[in-house]
Design a protein with these regions (language model features):
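Protease-domain processing segments flanking chymotrypsin-fold serine proteases, especially trypsin-like
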Residues: 2-90, 95-96
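Short glycine/Trp-rich loop-beta-loop segment that forms part of the substrate-binding cleft
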Residues: 176-223
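Catalytic nucleophile loop of clan PA
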Residues: 251-285
Length: 321
């Protein structure tokens, strides 16, 4: 395999999509818009930050496009050439100290055999349709948190050892650093009505088209937007969690299931508005969680549970020293 991945013919990189508590909208595959769409006059908020409900759909799509830099779809292949493969989950590129790899949910990768020549072949789908096949010999699977009977906690880190493949990924995408303290991250992104987004590749949107000997996989990089509520954050046995509530009904286009989003990143957002021209900008953002569980409350309500800040910046890594 070439050290520099090319655009594979059998992959169509997903459109960036955006969602909210009650709805999700699909965006065409275009570059981020430079100007926000027409909208009502936005009132100034305390600290000049805006709630996600004040943010136009076009700008939410732009945020999803920007955060795609860190997103990966996880794929499994039966052979080293990855001619037959399946997409089975989501993840995010991270760096912890001198380690580079993919942070995801443990249940997504617990059956993968890695570390030797006769192990399984893993591949990553990066932004703009780049696909990187990772030979098992350059991968180390770290079980950061093995789920118990209640399906918690649930974290794993697939370390990518120094290799041409790691170099290729670093040239294309970005690795989020996890060396900041969880206290500092919490200061800027924890609070009632603070916006956040859950990102992944829902299986409900996967399509497989076979034309002769060629298999086309179509997947969608999807962003769902929320605001932190009174009961969104909780802690059990030292692990902290955040939940995103999805309500069905009306004209929303939420997927019936969030299967495939497991392992995907949760990002905290700070969105500001220029007082002079009203233009919106993503002031800053931070990785604040990893999604791992969907909970069906009723026909009209489904919750997505994710590990939160302390878990992914501190607690999960203690076993690695």
């Amino acid at each position: 395999m070439s050290n520099k991945p090319s655009h594979p013919k059998n992959f169509v990189y997903p459109e960036n999509t955006a969602g909210s508590k009650a709805a999700m909208s699909h965006a065409p595959r275009v570059k981020p818009v430079k100007k926000p769409a027409k909208r009502k006059i936005l009132k100034a908020k305390k600290n000049n930050y805006l709630k996600f409900t004040d943010v136009p759909r076009s700008f939410r799509e732009k945020i999803g496009y920007e955060l795609a830099d860190y997103s990966v779809a996880l794929g499994y292949a039966e052979d080293a050439k990855a001619t037959k493969f399946e997409i089975f989950g989501s993840g995010v590129l991270v760096r912890k100290g001198n380690r580079f790899g993919v942070l995801t949910a443990h249940h997504c990768v617990h059956k993968l055999r890695l570390g030797s020549f006769d192990s399984d072949t893993l591949f990553l789908v990066l932004k703009r349709c780049h696909r990187v096949v990772l030979p098992p010999i350059i991968l180390v699977k770290h079980a950061l948190a093995i789920p118990k009977a209640n399906k918690e906690p649930d974290l794993a880190f697939i370390e990518i050892l120094p290799s041409p493949q790691l170099g290729s990924i670093r040239a294309i995408a970005s690795f989020w650093p996890l060396d900041e303290t969880h206290f500092n991250i919490s200061k800027g992104f924890v609070g009632i009505e603070k916006p956040f987004t859950v990102i992944g590749f829902p299986g409900a949107y996967h399509q497989t088209n076979i034309e002769g000997n060629t298999t086309h996989k179509i997947i969608k990089h999807t962003a769902f937007f929320y605001a932190i509520g009174q009961d969104s954050i909780r802690e059990r046995d030292g692990w902290d969690y955040i939940e995103a509530n999805n309500r069905y009904g009306g004209k929303n286009e939420l997927p019936k299931s969030f299967e495939g989003v497991s392992g995907g990143p949760v990002w905290g957002l700070q969105i500001s508005r220029d007082e002079t021209n009203g233009e919106l900008s993503l002031k800053t953002f931070s990785l604040i969680g990893i999604a791992f569980l969907q909970i069906r409350i009723s026909k009209q309500e489904l919750r997505v549970r994710a590990h939160f800040i302390k878990s992914i910046y501190d607690l999960a890594w203690r076993s690695l020293g």
